[in-house]
Amino acid sequence: TWMVRLCLPLAVVMEKFCARLKRGTTAKTQSDHIMDIITLVQAAKAEQLIHNREELIMIHAATLSARRVKTAHVPREAVRVFDARLSLLENITTLGPKLHRSYPVSRDGTLDQLTGYIRVRELFVQNLTSPASDWRDLIRPVLHIDEKASLTQLLTLFLEKQEIAALVDDPQNQITGWITMDDVMKVLMGARV
């Protein structure tokens, strides 16, 4: 019995210590999981199982949930807009020879009077198949996303709504910019960090 009295406190301390260790190994944070992925990707690169570009894409994909829309969007002052008052030719001439895939559409040519957005590819298909059609018939409803949302949340929104662009809003619901699937791809490819 004296041996039990002597060992009991030691056994209780060891039990609590082991329980604490066990808890520490199972309760990983999101950043721990991301670091595990990055370590595995770097190990695969070191073993020459993947190339430099693949390593970069995988690391950026693993950290997508930590990146905010605000870091990848086109700021308000740089957003180019289709003006609903102008013809298709006038809009394209105004925007210049290098077009993006999509543009917000506005009643007055500013971000303050938006009516939706337009996909340039659809404009050209319509122009080829029925040139007399009005380009405004192709205006799509525009999505909105909070600038503090993660890029993973943005991609989920794009997939759920089957859209490729969104307006970026601040906490006061003021438009701060424009973001497209292309902007997210640039982050994934490492062209924008």
Specify the residue positions occupied by each region the protein language model found.
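Membrane-embedded alpha-helical segments of inner-membrane proteins
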Residues: 1-43
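Soluble cytosolic regulatory domains appended to membrane proteins
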Residues: 28-193
